[in-house]
Amino acid sequence: MLIENTVNKLNEMRLTTMAKAFKDQLTDTNIANMSFEDRFGLLVDQEWTARKNNHLKRLIKNARFSESGACIEDIEYHADRNLDKAQIARLSTCNYITERHNILLLGATGSGKTYIACALGMAATRNFLQVRYIRLPELLTELSIARGNGTYRRVIQQYKKPALLIIDEWLLYPLKETEARDLLEIAEARYKKASTIFCSQFDIPGWREKIGDPIIADAICDRIVHNSYSIIIDCKESMRKRKGIKEI
């Protein structure tokens, strides 16, 4: 009865892994000969590991990666991509996030920017950091709706929170003035407070052209560019083509 009560109390406290491990110990003859301290240590380790794994799963789910299977180890370093493997390895340690720096991921369509960004994001979740991936068109739509229903400041705060924000399709299209001001709000909210990865087909002069208003463009770029590492992918062949169906 005492054992059953103990298991029930563990479950009631939501220590379900520890409860199961405790029951397993009762039938394991090898563990029966261990000291109380060692047995208890095993129970704590199993509960701690389960909680860490569940936390990681939640972080990955909430990040909403478009490439959910992306990882640093699977990045392809073809010669024509001119990727600096040592640089990416350094960035995968996530020190740039601790230092509140950004990453500019620049390259033509199909060069694999999104995959690399998601791989870096996955590395951040492995370090138990909050990450959020979003395409810029979706972000602008969300901010436009928020302005209309009175939740604008709340949404800005939501995008201020993640330790790493990944914005894909950055400035792919020319902005309206209200959209440019929205991006300035995001840039200001995260400036020197959190890190952002910007995936873009265009270099900085191209950004200014897409933003339009030169004053807003200066304000946005000043909050992003001077605090960023750059990864420039000079890809001769699209990664989509490389991974597409081969002719028989």
Language-model segments: residues:
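Charged, compositionally biased N-terminal leader segments and the immediate start
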Residues: 1-20
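Interdomain "pre-motor" coupling segment immediately N-terminal to P-loop NTPase/helicase cores
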Residues: 16-68
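N-terminal pre-Walker A segment at the start of P-loop NTPase domains
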Residues: 70-92
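Conserved hydrophobic/aromatic pocket- or pore-lining residues that grip, position, or stack substrates
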Residues: 75, 117, 135
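Phosphate-binding P-loop
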Residues: 92-100
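Walker A/P-loop
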Residues: 105-129
